Amino acid sequence: MEKALILSIFIFSLLLGITSYSIYISFGPLSKTLRDPFEEHEE
């Protein structure tokens, strides 16, 4: 029981960390350096 709880908490925090990092990259200060392929090929 204790092993399963620790594993589930680890997986949950790993997913939460990945989600938080991707949101930070998408909308944070580094988002200014991301290129937009749709804007480049707009006619």
Swiss-Prot record:
Annotated membrane topology: Single-pass membrane protein
Keywords: Chloroplast, Membrane, Plastid, Thylakoid, Transmembrane, Transmembrane helix
Any Pfam family matching the protein: PsbN
Compartments where located: Plastid, Chloroplast thylakoid membrane
Predominant localisation class: plastid
Keyword Transmembrane helix: yes
Chain ranges passing through the membrane: 5-25
A cellular component term, taken from the record's GO annotations: chloroplast thylakoid membrane
Family: Belongs to the PsbN family.
Biological role stated in the UniProt entry: May play a role in photosystem I and II biogenesis.
Protein name in UniProt: Protein PsbN
Species the sequence originates in: Cyanidium caldarium
Gene that specifies this protein: psbN
